[in-house]
Structure formats: C-alpha cells, structure tokens
Amino acid sequence: MTGIAVQLYTLRNEMEQDFYGVLEKVKELGFEAVEWAGLYGHPVAEVAAFAGKLGLKSAALHVSLDRLNGEIEAVIAEAHALGATRVVCPYVDQKYHSPDGYRAVRKELEAAAKTLSAAGLAFSYHHHDFELATEVDGRSALEYLLDGDGISAELDLYWLKKGGRDPLAFLQPYAGRVPLMHVKDMSDDAAQSFAEVGTGSIDFAPILAWGQAGGTEWFIVEQDVCPGNALDSVAISIANLRKLLNK
C-alpha cells in the first residue's frame, strides 16, 4: 500500500519558526511520513528521536548535489539516523543545463548512487521542467538522467505537465522505477501556478492507480508556493488525496 508523505520544503517558512511544532501538526493532519529538506540546524539524533516518538517515518532525504559530491558519508549517517532508506537529489544548477552538463551530472549521480547503495540506501533524482527542455542523445535530459545506473525517479506531476508532457503517459515506461512521486496540482488557468491537490487541472485518479500498481512507495504532497498558510494548503491536499485513495 502506497503511503502519504509531505515534502517539508513546502513548510519551510513555518519550520524556521517552529520546527518541532510543524512535525506535530503534520502528524495530526494524517501524514505517515515526511521527506526531509534540511534539519534547520537541529541535531539529527534529536530530530530522529522526536519523529520516532510521533510515529512519523522518513520517506527520503533531499540532498544537494554539492553534499552528495563533498560529504556523502555525512549524508549516509544522517539517513541512517533518521531511518530513511532513500536519498534524493532535488535539483541541479543552471550551469549544468546543457547536453554536456547533463552528461557530467549523470556521472556524478551514478557515483553517488553507487556509494549510497553500498551503504544500503537507494537513490532517486527529482526533476523540474528544465530537464524536459534540453535534449541529450535523442531524448530529454530527464530521460537521459533516469537511464543512469542506480538512478530511480522521483517524478513530479506538476513539473511534468509544466514541461509540456502528459504525466500519465510519461510514467508508463517507468513501472517499478518510481518509488517516490510528488503529487502536486496545477491551477486550471493561464497562470499554471502551484495548487492544492484536487483543486486544479491534473487528473490524479489514473496516475495514483498507476503508482499503486507500479510499486510507488510514497505519494508525497508538495506545493512550492502556497497562497496563504502552507499548513492550510497541505491540509487541503491530504484531505483530497485521501478521498482519491479512499483512505
């Protein structure tokens, strides 16, 4: 059964003010797990103990390419302490947004994946829309990166649609290779802005069914920008997502 998590980047402003209070609220809203986007200076052992007491699991850690390249042993220790089994690279800098840049990045990601695998951790890449705008060796840069050894996908439904792709169609070749999915809606207007799940233009039902059948472990709510209080936005998203999943 695919679980429901939240990407804590969504709640970054709230977490800066009340890190542990936000974790409590996330649990109260019904999230089973979180996807970490930094610990805001809190000791990892303290965070792990607090999350464990709440019963909040760790879906994954988002870790920058710089950290993967420069301090991967610390990343491994952090993941193990938090009880996470997956590490995700969330973004690559603009300097890499060219065919040669993506070729270099894939080598770095493959090296990180190999080191993480030896430590019992799986690796995924999270994309935006820019990887769909560049072609590498006859396919999009995203598809090129996902062809790398040891690189699973964290596919983001909003960014697939923003990049001009049909999310459900794009998913089809990746059955069994999308353990993490960012469930994110797009406003049904010309602005194509971020929206709470179930309030926009994305048809989630067939996508969620595909994920459940295709081995997705976590449906992860994320909203890069919220119109008001981000906790209110994720509350709407999880309520609608649970209805879609009959949870």
PLM feature spans:
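Glycine-rich, proline-tolerant flexible connector loops at the mouths of alpha/beta enzymes
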Residues: 31, 35-51
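Active-site beta-loop-alpha junctions enriched in small/polar residues
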Residues: 9-11, 37-39, 62-66, 92-94, ...
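Histidine-acidic metal/acid-base catalytic patches
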Residues: 1-28, 52, 80-83, 117, ...
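Active-site acidic/histidine proton-transfer and metal-coordination neighborhood
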Residues: 24, 33, 65-153, 160-162, ...
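Active-site mouth loops of central-metabolism enzymes
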Residues: 5-17, 61-69, 96-101
